[in-house]
Design a protein with these regions (language model features):
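Internal helical hairpin/lid segments
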Residues: 114-169
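Glycine-rich, charge-decorated loop segments at or immediately adjacent to ligand/cofactor-binding or catalytic sites
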Residues: 35-45, 193-200
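Short, acidic/small-residue loops that bind anionic groups at enzyme active sites
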Residues: 16-40, 48-54, 183-184
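Short glycine-rich anion-binding loops that position phosphate/pyrophosphate groups of nucleotides
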Residues: 4-7, 130, 160-161, 190
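ATP/nucleoside-binding phosphotransfer catalytic cores, i.e., glycine-rich phosphate-binding loops
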Residues: 159-217
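Conserved anion/nucleotide-ligand pocket segment
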Residues: 46-108, 112
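Buried hydrophobic positions in well-ordered alpha/beta secondary-structure cores of metabolic enzymes
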Residues: 33, 107, 155, 202-205
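N-terminal small/polar loop signature for handling phosphorylated ligands or for N-terminal nucleophile
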Residues: 1-24
Length: 217
C-alpha cells in the first residue's frame, strides 16, 4: 500500500525490475500520482493493481467507514460490481474491456512511454484542482494517440475536485461522447474526495450505463 501521492512516481519507472514483481506478485494499491506505478506494473507484468486509499493520506487521518469497508471487502473477498451513484450519463450504452486509468494528469505525463494496455479498455479518470481547459487538453492529447482512441470502449469519470467551471466540464464530455459514440458517464466514487472505493485496475469488466453499473467478469 502506498503511503501517499504527490509527485515523482514517474521518475521510478525506468528503475524498477518488473520481472521481480511479476515473479513475486503482491497486492499493490494507491491512487493519484501512484497511478504511474499502477499502470506500468500492469503493462509490464499483466498483474492487476488496485485503486485504493493510502496509508498516510487516508488511513493516517480520519478515514470514513465507507472507504474502510470497501478497502477490506475488495482485498479480502473480491468485488463483483460497482454501482455508479448520482451519475450523469453523457452517452448511453454497454461496453466491455479492462478497467484502466486513474489520475488524468499523471496519465498524461506517461505519454512518450509504452504504457497503454494491449486490450480494449474502459477508461476511468479523476483529478484535482485542474481547470476544465486543461482537462480538455489532456483528454485531447490522449485521444490523438491512435492506440488509445482505437482501444477506448467507454469512459467513466470519478471525482474532479476543485473544478473552475462545472458547465464547461459537462459540455465538454457531452460533446466528446457524441463524437466518440461510446458509453460515457460520471458516478465512480474515486479520486481526492473523502469517500473512495477500492477496485482493480486491469480487471475485465462490463460497463452498462442503463443500469449504472460496472460488472467484473
Amino acid at each position: 500500500i502506498a503511503c501517499r501521492g504527490g509527485y515523482g512516481a514517474i521518475r521510478l519507472l525506468d528503475k524498477i525490475d518488473y520481472d521481480i514483481i511479476k515473479n513475486n506478485p503482491k497486492i499493490f494499491c494507491g491512487y493519484s500520482d501512484i497511478t504511474a506505478l499502477e499502470l506500468m506494473i500492469y503493462k509490464r507484468t499483466g498483474l492487476v493493481t488496485y485503486n485504493a486509499p493510502m496509508a498516510y493520506s487516508d488511513f493516517g487521518s480520519d478515514i470514513d467507514d465507507f472507504s474502510t469497508k470497501s478497502f477490506f471487502d475488495t482485498l479480502q473477498t473480491g468485488i463483483k460490481e460497482i454501482t455508479l451513484n448520482s451519475s450523469t450519463v453523457f452517452y448511453d450504452g454497454i461496453c466491455s474491456g479492462v478497467l484502466w486509468g486513474g489520475n488524468l494528469s499523471t496519465i498524461q505525463s506517461l505519454c512518450g512511454l509504452d504504457f497503454l494496455p494491449e486490450e480494449n479498455f474502459i477508461f476511468i479518470a479523476e483529478d484535482i484542482n485542474e481547470p476544465v481547459y486543461k482537462i480538455d487538453k489532456m483528454f485531447t492529447q490522449l485521444l490523438n494517440m491512435p492506440a488509445f482512441k482505437n482501444r477506448l470502449k467507454g469512459i467513466v469519470l470519478g471525482d474532479f475536485s476543485g473544478l473552475d467551471n462545472e458547465k464547461y466540464f459537462q459540455d465538454f464530455f457531452k460533446e466528446l461522447s457524441q463524437e466518440l459514440k461510446i458509453p460515457t458517464t460520471t458516478g465512480l466514487k474515486f479520486g481526492h474526495e473523502k469517500q473512495k472505493l477500492t477496485f482493480p485496475i486491469g480487471a475485465n469488466a462490463v460497463l452498462d450505463t442503463n443500469l449504472s453499473k460496472i460488472t467484473f467478469i
